Amino acid sequence: MDNLVLCEANNVPLTPITFLKRASECYPNRTSIIYGQTRFTWPQTYDRCCRLAASLLSLNITRNDVVSILAPNVPAMYEMHFSVPMTGAVLNPINTRLDAKTIAIILRHAEPKILFVDYEFAPLIQEVLRLIPTYQSQPHPRIILINEIDSTTKPFSKELDYEGLIRKGEPTPSSSASMFRVHNEHDPISLNYTSGTTADPKGVVISHQGAYLSALSSIIGWEMGIFPVYLWTLPMFHCNGWTHTWSVAARGGTNVCIRHVTAPEIYKNIELHGVTHMSCVPTVFRFLLEGSRTDQSPKSSPVQVLTGGSSPPAVLIKKVEQLGFHVMHGYGLTEATGPVLFCEWQDEWNKLPEHQQIELQQRQGVRNLTLADVDVKNTKTLESVPRDGKTMGEIVIKGSSLMKGYLKNPKATSEAFKHGWLNTGDIGVIHPDGYVEIKDRSKDIIISGGENISSIEVEKVLYMYQEVLEAAVVAMPHPLWGETPCAFVVLKKGEEGLVTSEGDLIKYCRENMPHFMCPKKVVFFQELPKNSNGKILKSKLRDIAKALVVREDDAGSKKVHQRSIEHVSSRL
């Protein structure tokens, strides 16, 4: 059989952009997007994406060019997950929580030709563009403003606007034919940044094949069914909305887009549109629980929720499910192109007491259908740990859905893929039934509201402060976000009590990094605990931090039901 060959008929590259064309042909009467009063069908969304792709081609966007976007969960953000890769270009969704300096670092590193900006972030981008020349002399990306669909607001001077590109786009027969013909399924489809706060940010390059496989595995692992109504509470900028941007199209579902995610908005849209699915981190559960009683109306059928990040406490899962939600726990990371583990329900669990069922739901689960393998290995011997639910090791994975690597960072790519696995840096166990459960994060990661914060990055900023001699940052409990940074600092001799206070350092951090990364507490020590090799013992500092409490006014718990949470995303 070796003489059989691959040809154009039996070797078509895998890409999720084909889901869009299929949806337009198979579900012509299904609503694809709901956004306020705006409604689109799948044929209309297909037409809009084709027109935008044609306009991008007319602007000389070609294969492997980067096109960035800074926008909330609005229709444009969804459409660009198809229209940009239809041209062969690479989509770069940017975290809307970041400050101007961090976004400038990302743009310098990604070098996009075009930057789409939602009107809400136009002032921020003006500041970003002023910062870019201080890093290197490179042309600014062309700015294209995204207004509301029915807006009459004028774009930036001499620049185009998003809806204008769609109106002007005229796909030709040749361009239309090429839009769905990916050159190679290993070509990049998206560039997602795990961190943009250092001089060496990690831009994760995702392939068409990886996105295709991840989207399908989510459909199967989450049991999405046909025609899901998906509420966008998870930011699309985070790992392409865990690839649900493509999954919903594959099932001919409906995307319910909301600009600002609050508890009242969630409940309102669930009731208005019959939402069946949504994704979020456990932090969002607290918003839902603390919403007004009038918002928490009974659901005609359970809303399926896929959650990730820190493991939600059993009591939290129980309370959320009493509101009409059914929770499935998952695990993934940007480097894995979204979820790779799902806590799939087993029939025998139905016979267990409720508290045992919820305890089982807390686990991260078993590998998805398209992941080749997952294991937990001893970090020293590299041997698999016993499946006893007690012996901890590093979670490692392998499969065709994983990232291609880190952009312009071969050293980090090699380190991530050493020993033939993707090394997640997360510590966990495997239970006798094969289910994986995370027990700890790698030492320098703090999980705050689902966002990954590197303690090393926070420490770098603290060390920039003139009076700081030593600094170590660990996680401390936070009543709203789960964890938040806590800094332990040693001041230079003779500086104690003179000019530097806890407030001074917190203020300095807020001026030099994204606010969500800033320490909520600073503890001054005469000397930090160290081992015999002079290494700071963060384990001891974590024990101290566990006893610390964030003040209620810092937590914002009294206003939690009003606070916008669209920025909450997760390393699953």
UniProtKB/Swiss-Prot annotation:
This protein's UniProt keywords: Fatty acid metabolism, Ligase, Lipid metabolism, Peroxisome
Recorded GO CC terms: peroxisome
Alphabetical list of SUPFAM superfamilies matching this protein: Acetyl-CoA synthetase-like (SSF56801)
Enzyme Commission numbers on file: 6.2.1.2
Main location, first listed in the record: other
Tissue expression remark: Expressed in flowers.
GO molecular function, one term: medium-chain fatty acid-CoA ligase activity
Top class in the EC scheme: ligase
Biological processes annotated in GO: butyrate metabolic process
Protein name in the entry: Butyrate--CoA ligase AAE11, peroxisomal
Upper lineage: Eukaryota, Viridiplantae, Streptophyta, Embryophyta, Tracheophyta
